[in-house]
């Protein structure tokens, strides 16, 4: 049953969403009290970071990717912002990559990348790519990829936020909507196969979240808390007393924390110390953890 979730309603002074104006603002604000341990993602490869995931092969490493316009490629960085590796997905087209997530199945580190952007809501289906996480300290070509073609049950949707829920083995997708009426969907991870094959699935809609312009989501791998991010705030939904029910969890009143004033935050990931890390679009973009003590 679809549940209407009234977690929070944000009221805007105008109907125009004002996005952070320049990369110089990122650098000026990167040392504000809103974020800690801020570094810059150095190099010319990443100029529109749209997804972020903590490596489960090396917890000192991060994976990210560009938005549309790049090759089907991931980049690995250390906590100093230096690139340590990259990964090319063979035979995959990057139409509009918007998010990624890391997780483990039976001790095997995995990554999922979502080609799910659809600003005009015209795509008949989207793609999720699941594969074993490569070494973040090397350059790797990946050809064993589980390709999941996903159709929404209620028509085309623009989505920029996905996560993996370790307890249910579901991939979580949350719609990006200008209105605070974002659809919440899940896709069950297919069983592992020695030879991955393309599959087609219909996502299950499990609820509606009253937060507009959602750009990122991640699930704490240890306690199951869900972090939802839009351009201005982060929302932490505690898993306590929800019995692993995603809709019930996202129906709770969240803790709300203002984001740093960076150019355009579209990527977030939770580490194993329950810290939420963020990055922004733009060349030499900041990477830092949200200050949870404010």
Annotate each PLM feature.
Residues 4-6, 42:
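Hydrophobic alpha-helical context, especially transmembrane and signal-peptide helices
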Residues 21-294:
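Sequence/structural signature of beta-propeller domains
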